[in-house]
């Protein structure tokens, strides 16, 4: 198991109150594969440096988790398939 930080930029048309529950649904693969979600930090709506899919803003969320590399690959794949996700970035923490 390794420590990861996942940054997700969501579509700004989503209601900010529903971002938390929808992230929990997206992160279900981590729990089913035996990983652990350490922290979910929702930064809220921010202006993007450049447009992504014709959007100038996005809702940022940062997730700290502990999981196997295969689980994180599957999470990144599923987030990429989700239409409400504009962009993801996965970083591995060395502790």
Curated annotation (Swiss-Prot):
InterPro entries from the UniProt entry: Ribosomal_bS6, Ribosomal_bS6_CS, Ribosomal_bS6_sf, Ribosomal_S6_plastid/chlpt, Transl_elong_EF1B/ribsomal_bS6
One example GO MF annotation: structural constituent of ribosome
One GO CC annotation: ribonucleoprotein complex
Pfam families: Ribosomal_S6
Keywords from the named record: Ribonucleoprotein, Ribosomal protein, RNA-binding, rRNA-binding
Top-level taxon of origin: Bacteria
Biological process per Gene Ontology, one example term: translation
Family under the similarity heading: Belongs to the bacterial ribosomal protein bS6 family.
Role: Binds together with bS18 to 16S ribosomal RNA.
Name the record gives this protein: Small ribosomal subunit protein bS6
